[in-house]
Structures are given as C-alpha cells and as structure tokens.
C-alpha cells in the first residue's frame, strides 16, 4: 500500500485520503466521492473479498495505479451490515465542504466509526438480541469486566474473582466486540472470540477511568452508583467509555449511570450450565427448542431482550420475585387486551438511543410518536388493576402529552427514510417553510402551464417540458419536429430521437424553483435538528418509560404463557430444598406429540441427593434438566410447569450433563467431564442445585466407578448440595445404606422379549437392570449382534454372578470385592529364598509349586 512517507508524490486528493487513512490504519475507510463511498489500496482489496464487489483501478498516483472498490452511498447500510457481521470496523468519511466554493479537494472528515459493538442503526442490529460492547481487565487480584449496550445506554460492570467466573460472564453476555489490554495474560480465555480489539495499557488507567465516568455522569464521585470500591471493574469501564467516545464522535446523553453486578445478587450459572440447559441457544448453536423459544412470545423487541436478560440472570431477592408473581397473576385476565396495544409500541428503547446520538431518522420519530400515542390507552387498561407493582409500572410509563402533540404537529404521518429527501416536516408547523414550499410548488405549476401554452402556440404535439439533474429544466421536441423550433429556442442537448432547448423564461423559473426547493430543504433540516433539541431534555424520563413498557411486555407475556401452558405459581421458602408436584420439562412437553409424563421431586436436608438409575432414553436427563429449568423459571419470577412447587434458597445451578470432545483445545470427552466436575466440587455450596449425569464414563470401569462414588460422597457428606446424580453404576445404589440424606429413585421401563417400553415415570428405589441391549435393539443394532451380546452377557454373569452387586464400602472406598485369600503357591513363593537353594532343591520346588497351583 502507498504510505504517508512519500506524500508529495501524490495527487492532492490522494494526499487528503492518505492523511485520513493514517489516522485509522487498522480499519476500513469509506471515503465519500460524490454518490459513492470509495476504498483504495489494501482497503479496496480487502473490501472486494469481504463484500464480493469488483476490484478496479482509479487512475494513478505517485506513478502507481490505485486499486479501488466502491459502493453507492444509498446502499451503504447493507454493506456495513455485512462487514459488522464479519467483525470488521469501518470509518465513515464524509464531504463537509461545499464543492462550489472550494479550490482543490473538497474538505472531508471522519464523522463516525462503525464497529460491531457500537452500532445503533436499525439495519445493522438484530432486533431481539442485545448487542454489547465489552472491556476486560486483569490484575493479580482478579478480573474487571464492563459491558455497554449503546442502543439502550445500559452500562454494567463486575469483578469476577476467578477464571471460571470470567468465562461464564463472557458466555452469558456474548459481546459483539471485546476490548482487552495489550498485556492481557489469560489469552486463552478470549482467543477465537469475535470482534477482539487490543488497546494500549494507559486506556485502563484507574484515575483516567474515574475522571471519564464522572465527566459522563456529571458527578464529583462514583459513590452514588455503588462502584467506588471496584477498581478493576472501573479500569474496564473507563477504557470502554473512551472507546465509545472515540468512535461515536458525539455526546452520549443516554448513558446516565453505571451499575455494579454482584455475584450474591443473582443465581450463578457457569458456562457449561448455560450450554447444557439450552436457555437461549441449543447445543447445535441454533435457537429452536430452547427455553426462550417456548417462553418468549413478547410483542416488542425490547421486551424480548429483557426476558433473555432475566433468563440469564435469575435474581435471588424474593421480594422482587414475589412482586413479579403478583403482577403476572393480576395480568392473566388482561393479556388479550394489553398485548395488541403493546405491539404498537415497537422498539422505543433503541429509537431513544438513536435520538441521543442524533442519528434518529424521520421514521424513528414517527414510530416514537406512535409509541407515545399508545400510553393513554395502556394507562387506562391498567388503572383499575389493584396491585401496587402494576401501578408502579403505570406511573413509570408517564404520559408525555406535550411531546406527543409536538411530534403530531411537526412530522407528517408517513415520512420518507431520510431528511435530505425533504417532505418530513408537516404543513402548518413552520410558516416560513410553508412559504418556500408554496413558491416551489407554484413554480412547478407554472412550468406545467408553460408546456401546454408552447405546445398549442407552436402546434408541436411532441413538445414537453422536463428536468434532469445535469441540464436542469428543458423543452424537448422530437427529431421529426425539431426543424419547427422558433429561433429563440437555444439548443442545450441532442439525443438520438429528440432535441432539448432552453429559453430565457424557463431559465428564470428554473432558478426560482431550485432556489425555493433548496431553501425549503435547508430550513427543513434546521427544523428537524431543532426537534432533537426539544426532545432530548426529556430523554431520561423517556428511557424510564421505555424500560417500564419493556417490563410490562415481559410480565404480560409470562401471564399469557402461564395461562396457555398451564403453569403454576411457585412459593418460596426460607428452608433449603425443592418440592415439585407433577413437574414437566417446559421445552420437551411442547415438542412431544404424545402427552408428557409429569413427575414429582423432593429434595430437602434429610433427602439432599437422589441417585437416579434407569435405562438410556428412559428420561433421566430430561428429569434432571426439568428440575433445573423449573428452579430457573421460579427465580425470574415466572410461573412454572408443574402442579405445585415450593422452593428454598438457591445460590448456584451446576450441570454436568452430556459432553463432547473439545478438539480445538485438545481435550477429550473425559477431560471435559472432569474439568466441569472439578469446578462443581470447588464451588458448590449447601444452597447449590447440582445435576450430575453419568460421571466416570470414558475411562476404565473401576476408575470411573471410583470417581463417581467419591464425587457423590463429597457432594452428599461434605458440600451437602441439593444433588441429582444419574448413573449406570448400580454399585452407587448402595450409597443410601451408607450415608444419610441420600435416596434412590429410578425411571421405569417394561421389557417384553426384544422390545422395551419407557414409562418415563419416576419411582422410589433403584432400577432392577439397565436395559442396555433392548435400547441397542431399538436403535437398530443388527439382530445377530444383539444375539451375540446376550450370549456374552450370560457368560459374564455366570463367571461373576455378583458383579452387579459388588460390595462397596464407602468408608474404605474398596470398590472391588473384598480382597481374595492369598493362594498357597504365592505364600510359598513369598517365604522362599532362591539364593540358598541347590540345583536339586530348586527342581523339587518347581514340582511342589506345580502341585499347589
């Protein structure tokens, strides 16, 4: 690529380009040239590959041809969306000078930088997902992590204590762009993530961070936000805010506060748990058959995003949860009236962000007006709901009568996409604008009359008055009649089948039309900008209203789901434990064609671990997952799929369910399983809900059994967590006899010949057998293989009839049967001293040992 070193050798235009490019060396530069954005040199080559557009040349500069690629300015959003989705950032360089008054290249400057984490344009965002920018910082005491959703102004920080917690946060928030310090030590934590941006160390400096944040919020200190004593989080937040200011190049009035997220405020779920429970993403990476796919019937995009945040951060404050439950109960008879009105509110949250950034388009203001028009009806529908939480939401919504009337007066009903197209401001809003428009419209009427007059006067039926951007207004006469044109008609352009002329009268009106249109458009832009100044003082109240509307949408949605799907309202208890009557899996019951078999569950301090046995495909994993999902739903304040639920305090949910090789990190299935198990054993508490499925697979039988036994023993005796422990090791069914607080349950099945019927019902006690061969037959394993397996099974059982009931002593961890007695031959050999034997004695010993064996 050509560089700034040999600047004088370039043309003036390329000198200007290279200076701007030097300020943004690592990102693509969209350089405005008339109706196109153009890219040069390496940017052009990269863009042609990323966007699949033609790579051409634009003349030469400094004696070298200039590689060039271009895109039309009116289609820029589509191309930006493609680049942002690929993790690219783009600097947008606009012409800010007037070509008519400029000598040499028109003045240009970068007006904004579009990055994956700072986009607010509607066309670039997925409407039902948060789009987060994040920053990560690390020192010897732990991590600092900050996230910002620029499309809502939601600014959060946290201080994860260890690597596992940090990994879980990255998975929960899934940022579109991640800023990290150039000396970041835990590179394996972030490698492979999209939108990584390396930043200099000084951007994470704590004093600069405090100064930046106080300046943004207009405060003297950060005590009021509860983040004063979170230095690592503040380092990350400071870098993040600086980056946003650098890229947006405008004030950020919608970012008004920062909130500390503390571990003790929410139920903690690690990365494996979020993945295994398929909350918003299934194991294949899609969104089908997830908890969100069943629960999310919200009618606004901002409500959908809020619901997903709730699902990923269940709260532990039962006062908040009971308020939500009361609201859901009160709205169950109202959702049919409320949802159609809420649907009209749309994505007010993101419209307000664009308003704050002054990038809102005319249609954003029209949508905002439409949203505000719904408030009186919503307030009326909620007025007689006798629940304090509902009335709180109603108050937060506000009315905004003046703003609504302002938008009704100022913006036409169906405005164009862009203000530069004109026709946005409504007639009657500005007298001066109406006058200029009348002049432009009057001149246009005159031109229509001129065409009729000239056609009749000259008797030329092909004569017509037209306009194009290059030649302005003209009179066109067909080639066949052009010889009849009067002498004062001055030829302006010759076409294949026609001639175009100009006359002084037409030129005079052209000037008048263009002047009046130009004046009207300039005034319209000015009035449009003034609308922002009138709306922005109310931004904080509008954001509060948008948040209340999103929450109302979520709660109305949960009321509808509870009613439609037959969910019950769970009750919270101070005592540890979970009691579920007729619990169901919220997703599986929707997918199944046949009725779902509901099952009970009881966990309490005296029954804190269930050893779950039963056949493969019998429903063990479903039973375990449904328990976790019912707990999760209860702790977002939702109703749950069961007949009755009572649930005690829960601080964490862990799942060790299913596994696959992590080939990218060089870890086998067994290694993945053991890593997840270690995390559980280190971090679970007596208030944790732990799901352990088939621990010990992937290694030898006795190794696996030993590990499973020791893990179960540790969870039951030492940690005392609420545990569901599914296993195929029947030896573990003896645990209830050796430890208090452990019970056996099994999933029932009936076997008839070579077939098996899964009953999917949970019964007390251990399963009688595994039904492995019946499941294999059901899976389509050839009959001769099944037949041979039955023979082998009988052989093994005859050799070791007690193998399945091996006595396992929990105190000694002797997982094999009691040691066998030493044979006489071995005893004789142990007492033998070979160095003292003569050759004859040695030979006699061989015969003697032979007889002992």
From Swiss-Prot:
SMART domains named among the record's database cross-references: MUTSac (SM00534), MUTSd (SM00533)
Gene Ontology CC terms: cytosol
Keyword ATP-binding: yes
One annotated GO molecular function: ATP binding
One Pfam family from the record: MutS_IV
Keywords associated with the record: ATP-binding, DNA damage, DNA repair, DNA-binding, Nucleotide-binding
Residues that bind ATP: 614-621
InterPro entries reported in the protein's UniProt record: DNA_mismatch_repair_MutS (IPR005748), DNA_mismatch_repair_MutS-lik_N (IPR007695), DNA_mismatch_repair_MutS/MSH (IPR017261), DNA_mismatch_repair_MutS_C (IPR000432), DNA_mismatch_repair_MutS_clamp (IPR007861), DNA_mismatch_repair_MutS_core (IPR007696), DNA_mismatch_repair_MutS_N (IPR016151), DNA_mismatch_repair_MutS_sf (IPR036187)
Domain of life where this protein originates: Bacteria
One GO term (biological process): mismatch repair
Presence of the UniProt keyword ATP-binding in the record: yes
SUPFAM superfamilies the record matches: DNA repair protein MutS, domain I, DNA repair protein MutS, domain II, DNA repair protein MutS, domain III, P-loop containing nucleoside triphosphate hydrolases
NCBIfam families: mutS1, PRK05399.1
Task of the protein: This protein is involved in the repair of mismatches in DNA. It is possible that it carries out the mismatch recognition step. This protein has a weak ATPase activity.
Family to which the UniProt record says this protein belongs: Belongs to the DNA mismatch repair MutS family.
This protein's name: DNA mismatch repair protein MutS
Biological source species: Klebsiella pneumoniae (strain 342)
